[in-house]
Amino acid sequence: MSERQLEKSIEHAVELAREARNIEVFTGAGMSADSGLETYRDDKTGLWSNVDPQAMASIDAWRKDPEPMWAWYRWRAGVAARAEPNAGHQAISYWEGSDTVEHVHITTQNIDNLHERAGSSDVTHLHGSLFEYRCSDCATPWEDDKNYPQEPIARLAPPQCEKCGGLIRPGVVWFGENLPVEEWDIAEQRIAEADLMIIVGTSGIVHPAAALPQLAQQRGVPIVEISPTRTELSRIADFTWMSTAAQALPALMRGLSA
């Protein structure tokens, strides 16, 4: 993107943001890329590049052999816990606290909790969280002991539920599982109330989450996409700001403050 094109992108985004009072921010893995967390879809460095998703992210795989999955998710939780919110996360939190808007809501596909750690208070997790755990059988919550492996390990036995003896599992949504109904309903409601949607760092190919921006489009909500590359959602966006979250969102805040 040329310098002039970048200026135009900022001007357009700022113009839309100035007129909006209720903001819906829809984020994916690219949101956390500048925090050092690899995206799932990156062909060269993606977290899935050397791992079969069906082997580490399906309920069937968990039922067959939970130890490799427990080891992997505990390691991932440690990686996420050591990461820091980037400038993009901080910018959204700043926006929420500014007097230019009434409300900023985040619907995220991420499971790293970096939005909350940056200070955002209204975050809906479509795919759960690395830091929430429950019994596989009775759903009793398990308090995280934060004893995370420092390096990936092949196998680790999940702890057992004190109530029923079932295995403790990560509180994330796997292939073969439904998205949480309450979170989905909240996301739909916030989109219904929004007068601007910002899409950040998502490929738009993970369903049903990818259908949410289409709801905004159907309502006539202006959509700004922030992504280094064009995605499946670019066609429904009013325009795509070809940049990263850590670059574009602070630039947007500076534009609003000018």
UniProtKB/Swiss-Prot annotation:
It is an enzyme of class 2 (transferase). It catalyses: N(6)-acetyl-L-lysyl-[protein] + NAD(+) + H2O = 2''-O-acetyl-ADP-D-ribose + nicotinamide + L-lysyl-[protein]; N(6)-succinyl-L-lysyl-[protein] + NAD(+) + H2O = 2''-O-succinyl-ADP-D-ribose + nicotinamide + L-lysyl-[protein]. CDD domains: SIRT5_Af1_CobB. Binds 1 zinc ion per subunit. Pfam families: SIR2 (PF02146). Substrate binds at Y73, R76. Zn(2+) binds at C135, C138, C161, C164. Its main location: cytoplasm. One of its GO terms (cellular component) is cytoplasm. Its EC number is 2.3.1.286. NAD(+) binds at residues 28-48, 109-112, 201-203, 245. The active site is at H127. Keywords: Cytoplasm, Metal-binding, NAD, Transferase, Zinc. Residues 3-258 form the Deacetylase sirtuin-type domain. It is found in: Cytoplasm. Disulfide bonds: none annotated. GO terms for molecular function: histone deacetylase activity, NAD-dependent; NAD+ binding; protein-malonyllysine demalonylase activity; protein-succinyllysine desuccinylase activity; zinc ion binding. Its cofactor is Zn(2+). InterPro entries: DHS-like_NAD/FAD-binding_dom, NAD-dep_sirtuin_deacylases, Sirtuin, Sirtuin_cat_small_dom_sf, Sirtuin_class_III, Ssirtuin_cat_dom. NCBIfam families: PRK00481.1-3. Belongs to the sirtuin family. Class III subfamily. PANTHER family: NAD-DEPENDENT PROTEIN DEACYLASE, NAD-DEPENDENT PROTEIN DEACYLASE SIRTUIN-5, MITOCHONDRIAL-RELATED. NAD-dependent lysine deacetylase and desuccinylase that specifically removes acetyl and succinyl groups on target proteins. Modulates the activities of several proteins which are inactive in their acylated form. 2 residues (Tyr-73 and Arg-76) present in a large hydrophobic pocket are probably involved in substrate specificity. They are important for desuccinylation activity, but dispensable for deacetylation activity. This is NAD-dependent protein deacylase. It comes from Corynebacterium glutamicum (strain ATCC 13032 / DSM 20300 / JCM 1318 / BCRC 11384 / CCUG 27702 / LMG 3730 / NBRC 12168 / NCIMB 10025 / NRRL B-2784 / 534). The lineage of its organism: Bacteria, Bacillati, Actinomycetota, Actinomycetes, Mycobacteriales. The gene is cobB.
